[in-house]
């Protein structure tokens, strides 16, 4: 009789284990995303990734130079004016490819060519009046937003493909993107030093 009123400790432990809530799929996805982000941050700091990126960047820039050498004289002026932008876009695409599509920002950069083509077609169909009204609407929304939300919105614009993501995902993507850019700067500085050191030798040998 008394035992029925007071259940044993073993039974209570078993029931508590049964009632333990399971981790939701969203929480599991966030944990997995953070794990991937941590591994990605470590990868950007390794010399091996930097060397691979530098080699791929040199190959990509060489292909760009080969395309420019086949252009006609009439297209030379346009090519020179857009050379800096093409080099920057090439460097960013190689950087995104180095991320192997594990991040949102890398996938956004790789898809930028397709979006640019679609944007040209859509821009021709838009009217001037709609653009003005939309611009005024964004300006009023910018004034109404609090300071923190406004800064997060700016951060979302700076990180490719992160304008409409949650705050935790935005911070993870921004952290990984910054680490990738830092690696990009180190690789470019190393390439610049190599080219500077090789320039006098090339001049002396005449090659």
Curated annotation (Swiss-Prot):
Region spans: Disordered: 1-25
Domain bHLH: 132-181
InterPro entries membership: bHLH_AtIBH1-like, bHLH_dom, HLH_DNA-bd_sf, IBH1-like
A cellular-component GO term for this protein: nucleus
Main location: nucleus
Residue stretches spanning the membrane: none
Record-level Gene Ontology MF annotations: DNA-binding transcription factor activity; protein dimerization activity; transcription cis-regulatory region binding
Keywords, sorted A to Z: DNA-binding, Nucleus, Transcription, Transcription regulation
Cell compartment(s), UniProt: Nucleus
Family annotation (CDD domains): bHLH_AtIBH1_like (cd11444)
The protein's role, per its UniProt record: Atypical bHLH transcription factor probably unable to bind DNA. Negatively regulates brassinosteroid signaling.
Subunit structure: Homodimer. Interacts with PRE3.
Protein name: Transcription factor bHLH149
Chain's gene name: BHLH149
